[in-house]
């Protein structure tokens, strides 16, 4: 049995992400995933680590006139790196399960998941 490789062009990738996002919203799964993600991040200490990083930045820059946007720009990449790999893996697994066989054909493609969780650093 010959295997075929599907090449997803950038515009198709954007369309696929948009379709997935829409399905997650319409079904209510996005909201459930946000709640799950928040609880796992709190349990794992991620939220506390991000708060500490924010406090350190503010303490070290209290004499400078910085904007909240500056803090967010600095902390966001740090916060993303601190997300435990198991939490990411569990989230992706749950999304794949939700999407079912339709996405299994594309399992070798990396789908970047953007999330605006309620516990992001600017809250």
Swiss-Prot record:
Coiled coil: none
Subcellular location as annotated: Nucleus, Nucleoplasm
Keywords: Activator, Chromatin regulator, mRNA transport, Nucleus, Protein transport, Transcription, Transcription regulation, Translocation, Transport
One GO CC annotation: nucleoplasm
GO terms classed as biological process: chromatin organization; poly(A)+ mRNA export from nucleus; protein transport; regulation of transcription by RNA polymerase II; transcription elongation by RNA polymerase II
Tree of life domain: Eukaryota
GO molecular function, one term: transcription coactivator activity
Classification via Gene3D superfamilies: 1.10.246.140
InterPro entries referenced in this protein's UniProt entry, alphabetically: TF_ENY2, TF_EnY2_sf
UniProt function note: Involved in mRNA export coupled transcription activation by association with both the TREX-2 and the SAGA complexes. The transcription regulatory histone acetylation (HAT) complex SAGA is a multiprotein complex that activates transcription by remodeling chromatin and mediating histone acetylation and deubiquitination. Within the SAGA complex, participates in a subcomplex that specifically deubiquitinates histones. The SAGA complex is recruited to specific gene promoters by activators, where it is required for transcription.
Subunit architecture: Component of the nuclear pore complex (NPC)-associated TREX-2 complex (transcription and export complex 2). Component of the SAGA transcription coactivator-HAT complex. Within the SAGA complex, participates in a subcomplex of SAGA called the DUB module (deubiquitination module).
The family this protein is said to belong to: Belongs to the ENY2 family.
Name this polypeptide is given: Transcription and mRNA export factor ENY2
Organism: Dictyostelium discoideum
Lineage of source species: Eukaryota, Amoebozoa, Evosea, Eumycetozoa, Dictyostelia
């Amino acid at each position: 049995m010959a295997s075929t490789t599907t090449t997803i062009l950038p515009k198709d990738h954007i369309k696929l992400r948009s379709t997935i996002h829409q399905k997650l919203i319409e079904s209510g799964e996005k909201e459930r995933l946000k709640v799950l993600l928040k609880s796992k991040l709190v349990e794992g200490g991620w939220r506390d680590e991000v708060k500490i990083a924010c406090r350190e930045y503010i303490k070290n820059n209290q004499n400078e006139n910085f904007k909240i946007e500056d803090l967010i720009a600095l902390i966001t990449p740090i916060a993303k790196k601190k997300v435990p790999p198991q939490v990411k893996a569990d989230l992706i697994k749950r999304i794949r399960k939700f999407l079912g066989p339709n996405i299994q054909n594309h399992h070798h493609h990396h789908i970047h998941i953007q999330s605006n969780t309620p516990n992001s650093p600017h809250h």
